Amino acid sequence: PDADVEAGHTDAEGYKGIFQQMMKEFGFKYVVSTLRESFSATHNGWKAMIYNGEEFYTSKRYDIDPIIDRVGGGDSFSGGIIHGLMTKPNQGAALEFAVAASALKHTINGDFNLVSVEEVEALAGGDASGRVQR
């Protein structure tokens, strides 16, 4: 594949081959992954990808600065993708919801995401600047 996972390169399109191999090997319905760009302990870029065997989708990228607490960000993403796949019209909308939920969690102290569905949807459907503000 074209992705250099060990070197930490975050070229999302390069992960498509890895996702295809995972689907072939394990028979997953979806393969989903987040990509973090770490500029400092309190400043990260954040996006994700989803693949269903036919369509590969990359979310918009969020610039999270400052990060208040990363703990719970992965759980928030996982809950967001489950919610999104159950309620949104397509995998792209589901992924945008999950990434927005996780990005917002990075701005909250503690391991619980205390935002509403409406707040997540407002960020996911925002102006695409990718700037997380609370």
PLM region descriptions:
Residues 2-134:
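Conserved phosphate-binding/catalytic region of the ribokinase-like
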